Amino acid sequence: MVNLQTQLKSEVGVLAEYISEELSVFIVAENKPDDHPANGGLRLLNYETDMECLQDGFRLANLMKSKHDLYSTGFSGGKVVARSSDISSVKEKLISVTSELLENLDGRMITGCDLNTDVNDMEKLYKLTPHVLAAVNSNVDASTATAMGVIGCLLYTSDAADEKRW
């Protein structure tokens, strides 16, 4: 897709990476100008390979791109994806590595919770880098808020199907 104002093609690519035997972390995001930082959650899964992790990162970053475009959030699409076969033992290293990668990007990527990360992880990450968008130090549980939105959509869809509105 071409940005009509800048005439630049907006593509998703790897902005930063860390690879080791126990943990690999990839920041995959759109290459938009600095005034449109990328946004997407930090996902930690037991991917079989780094390639599988990267492929999921590209898929998810493109979905985040569509989401941010649809809702005109001002963000570009991005995702932080991490691979480990021992998820519970790498959490501290994940937070440390991710903070360094985010800091090196100097605000081009902002992350939050996703699969196998929670607000406690985001609070630790936020102590190391300001590039976190989550319900840090809040009484609001962002996961509950997201779940309520999904439930609302399902209820609406169910009602619409019953009334044959589509």
Residue ranges, per PLM feature:
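N-terminal ligand-binding/catalytic initiation module
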Residues: 1-140
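Charged catalytic carboxylate motif
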Residues: 52, 56, 149, 157
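Short, well-ordered amphipathic alpha-helices
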Residues: 61, 153-155
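A glycine-rich, Thr/Ser-enriched phosphate-binding loop motif common to dinucleotide/cofactor-binding enzymes
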Residues: 137-153
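Single conserved hydrophobic/aromatic residue that forms the stacking wall/gate
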Residues: 156-166
